[in-house]
Amino acid sequence: MRISVSRIVGVDRRRLFTWSQDYARRLVWDSFLTDAYLPDGMTADVGVDAFCRSQSGATMVSRYISYRPPQVAAVEMIDGPKVLERFSGSWNFTERTPDTTEVKFTYHFRAQPAWLRWLLEPLIGAFYLVHTRRRLDSFKRWAEAEALPR
């Protein structure tokens, strides 16, 4: 199953991409997470793992499979909630004007067990859709405020 949410953010894409991948700042804006870090002081790049804990207490370790600043960062789950057989996500940053960016969060997942997939995937999809909208709205508010001259 796939869900995707996008917003137009009044900040240039280079800053948005950098801020979105800055784990030291992540919990300031990310309303979905209570913990997020790259182990051993690593910096985001292809092959690097990331640890995240959601507000519900679920944890996921994902691995960067694409990292192309300032355009896209993508990960796939290597360990996570047992209800997910597979999970991957991408955050895309498309310049609309020099100071305006379309930010799109897209997630793909497959639920398990297979015999319950017909029930689980729509429920998980609805959950992720609500939280992804909140998460991206929170990022937009934070980034636009952060970009204001001081």
Predicted stretch roles:
Residues 1-42, 149-150:
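Hydrophobic ligand-binding cavity/cleft-lining segments
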Residues 2-4, 58-62, 85-90:
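Short, surface-exposed coil-to-beta transition loops
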Residues 6-10, 37, 51, 63, ...:
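Generic structural detector for well-ordered beta-strands
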Residues 10-14, 65-70, 92-102, 146:
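A short, structured loop/turn motif at beta-sheet edges
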Residues 16-20, 26, 50, 64, ...:
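Hydrophobic pocket/interface hotspot
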Residues 48-55, 74-80:
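Short beta-strand segments that buttress and anchor functional surface loops
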Residues 60-67, 73-81:
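Helix-adjacent hinge/juxtasegments
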Residues 79-134, 139, 150:
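Beta-strand/loop substructures that line and gate deep hydrophobic ligand-binding cavities in soluble
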